[in-house]
Amino acid sequence: MDIRNEFLQFFQNKGHAVYPSMPLVPNDATLLFTNAGMVQFKDIFTGIVPHPSIPRATSSQLCMRAGGKHNDLENVGYTARHHTLFEMLGNFSFGDYFKEEAILFAWEFVTKNLGFKPKDLYISVHEKDDEAVKLWEKFVPVDRIKKMGDKDNFWQMGDSGPCGPCSEIYIDQGEKHFKGSEDYFGGEGDRFLEIWNLVFMQYERSNDGVLSPLPKPSIDTGMGLERVQALLEHKLNNFDSSLFAPLMEEISELTSLDYTSEFQPSFRVVADHARAVAFLLAQGVHFNKEGRGYVLRRILRRALRHGYLMGLKEAFLYKVVGVVCEQFSNTHAYLKESKEMVMKECFEEEERFLETLESGMELFNLSLKHLNENKIFDGKIAFKLYDTFGFPLDLTNDMLRSHGACVDMQGFELCMQEQVKRSKASWKGKQDNADFSAILNAYAPNEFVGYETTECPAKALGFFDSDFKEIIEANPNQEVWVLLEKTPFYAEGGGAIGDRGALFKDNEEAAIVLDTKNFFGLNFSLLEIKKALKKGDQVIAQVSDERLEIAKHHSATHLLQSALREVLGSHVSQAGSLVESKRLRFDFSHPKVLNDEELEKVEDLVNAQIFKHLNSHVEHMPLNQAKDKGALALFGEKYAENVRVVSFKEASIELCGGIHVENTGLIGGFRIVKESGVSSGVRRIEAVCGKAFYQLAKEESKELKNAKTLLKNNDVIAGINKLKESVKNSQKAPVSVDLPVEKIHGVNLVVGVVEQGDIKEMIDRLKSKHERLLAMVFKKENERITLACGVKNAPIKANVWANEVAQILGGKGGGRDDFASAGGKDIENLQAALNLAKNTALKALEG
């Protein structure tokens, strides 16, 4: 059964709108990762955004619980049901139906669609929710309904806000496998397994803790797909289900170990963590020293340590990650698109950690011998493992788990604090915590005049070094920040890079402006000093000519978003952007790849608006008025009460503080150069306009001219087709008579290399020519060696022969007893492969 599709279809038939899984990185500063199905509906539940036109929703949401408040990382591999990454099936009501329908829908799906027996189902409810008890009694005897307290059956989003009692459906997995003292309904054992949680959001909790009834109660439910899959397959552990089978097979092949061996927990850790690594990398999270990137790093390193336990001393996880990408490619197409990138990044991170893993393990094992009687691991050693060998603290604790020990946290924290004191503050720290308070007290916000002009006289209010310490004089070859009394330089923002240019003093260039940024409301420009400048100097500030090219790309970005919404639908919204002088990059919400027809329509629409020579129009107005006029706003962005609105007549209207062209005709032309996936539900378009558009057209024209010359045909398509036909015919050429043929004990032996032609067809021709044959033909193509072999009335199997030879080439072979093929990337081993092929054949013939 396709549980995901069954669930979504069931609720769609009940009038629910189906929502795609939102990215694992939410647009919510309070969350590290998307950890529940309700996250994408949080603003609806809290009233920040109005209820949708269809007040019922359903989704299958990818969730991540590693790091932050919800962290299952340390339990993964040691329990039957914990995962870092999992799918949560859910249905939601926004002030529409409530308890009765939610319970009815859940019971129907669980008993009819999933086929669970009613006699095996148990229900928990909040101790004060008599209404839910009465509703459940229609389906379940009262002795299988248990009342529980706030700890188990009351849900709230935070200390204040929407909240309410919840009801959970449990299934009895049978006493046959569970005989522990806690294996009773309501106990801590695994016999009674929770499969579905129904949250009845009917209250609002005030800041002082008082509960008030909501005028329109809502429903939020969640059910783990992995858990249901295991139950349907009568498995007592999620990792034993068919969802994880391809991963277990790959790990078994890599380790030459059986999944049912003593290393079963390590199998499970690697399988789980490979899924998390694959999805996080594919959705744009990268290995880092902090935040989400560090959580990703911790997950990978924990997996590598478990691989190490199973004897894997080289990079391996990237191969398991590749299997994940293939396994989920039908439901999450971006995994297939990004598979190569994901595997490469995973491999490189593995290589980095493996450089220190062996040494770190030696230190760890040595330190184990000196554990005190309380089994407390030295905090200083744990810190050294962290600081020198890259062992995250939870990895060290995980290694200590099997020894019944734990880290001396006080000692570890003390070492960490000492390092922080020694360390020089990072740029981010300087920016966030530096003497900006002193700067803000000393200087009022400088005046930005860049909308009206690209050049103006200005007074240098102050110069600052890289630590933002004020300096009196800036000398040649220094890089310093300057604060001008008024400035034409636009500060980086809204996706557009900061202005560059120059400062002139006494008609001479005194400094090159490398960049412009806004810190706490002040526009600073980064300078490379050419001629000494000091506080109070009068200068001429001049923006570089690239400003116009940036403006062209910025205006083109607005036209692009408008075109995307027209072609793809109003669901398109900006998810990120970059505007430079030579290109633009625009990320937007859309669930699938754009086809050629859609891309052509978008490009044509943008160019149509350019050719209309539409004037830009800038207005300042209250935020509500701007939204009423249909101005597009960036989701999640905080706006002031009064906003700047940029429009190009009917073509585009957006809230924007950036620099734009006065007329779309100045953009010149627009070309999409690339469309790709960024993460789940987010696509990216890269494009050029203005001078970059002309340069691209010029280069393409030159390439076309060269192609015509090489093909000796002014019709390039016809020339290419003719060339393809020629290549095809050459590949069909008969086997070269130059291939060496030896006759040994009545069997014709052919082992050789060809430069062109279809080697499989060559084998067929050889088999038709000779009554008894052993043949293996090699060919180098696309930085690989491919081989084909045929056996006819000879004492060896083709598939065995091919596979043995392929291993020298770093590959694998497959086929039948009479025919097989293989390939590998180790081109330098070709001669060794030839020798092995011949020696293996001779041995078989002599045997």
From Swiss-Prot:
PROSITE patterns, per database record: AA_TRNA_LIGASE_II_ALA
Gene Ontology cellular-component terms listed: cytosol
Keywords, in A-Z order: Aminoacyl-tRNA synthetase, ATP-binding, Cytoplasm, Ligase, Metal-binding, Nucleotide-binding, Protein biosynthesis, RNA-binding, tRNA-binding, Zinc
Recorded superkingdom: Bacteria
EC number, as in UniProt: 6.1.1.7
Enzyme class: ligase
Gene Ontology MF terms: alanine-tRNA ligase activity; aminoacyl-tRNA deacylase activity; ATP binding; tRNA binding; zinc ion binding
Catalytic activity: tRNA(Ala) + L-alanine + ATP = L-alanyl-tRNA(Ala) + AMP + diphosphate
Cofactor note: Binds 1 zinc ion per subunit.
Places the protein is found: Cytoplasm
Cofactor: Zn(2+)
Gene3D superfamilies, sorted: 2.40.30.130, 3.10.310.40, 3.30.54.20, Bira Bifunctional Protein, Domain 2 (3.30.930.10), Threonyl-trna Synthetase, Chain A, domain 2 (3.30.980.10)
GO biological process entries: alanyl-tRNA aminoacylation; negative regulation of DNA-templated transcription
Xref: InterPro entries: aa-tRNA-synth_II/BPL/LPL, Ala-tRNA-lgiase_IIc, Ala-tRNA-ligase_IIc_anticod-bd, Ala-tRNA-synth_IIc_core, Ala-tRNA-synth_IIc_N, Ala-tRNA_ligase, Ala_tRNA_ligase_euk/bac, DHHA1_dom
Binding site for Zn(2+): 554, 558, 656, 660
Domain comment, as recorded: Consists of three domains; the N-terminal catalytic domain, the editing domain and the C-terminal C-Ala domain. The editing domain removes incorrectly charged amino acids, while the C-Ala domain, along with tRNA(Ala), serves as a bridge to cooperatively bring together the editing and aminoacylation centers thus stimulating deacylation of misacylated tRNAs.
Function, as annotated: Catalyzes the attachment of alanine to tRNA(Ala) in a two-step reaction: alanine is first activated by ATP to form Ala-AMP and then transferred to the acceptor end of tRNA(Ala). Also edits incorrectly charged Ser-tRNA(Ala) and Gly-tRNA(Ala) via its editing domain.
PANTHER family for this protein: ALANINE--TRNA LIGASE, CYTOPLASMIC, ALANYL-TRNA SYNTHETASE
Family indicated by similarity: Belongs to the class-II aminoacyl-tRNA synthetase family.
HAMAP family membership: Ala_tRNA_synth_B
Protein name: Alanine--tRNA ligase
Species this chain originates from: Helicobacter pylori (strain HPAG1)
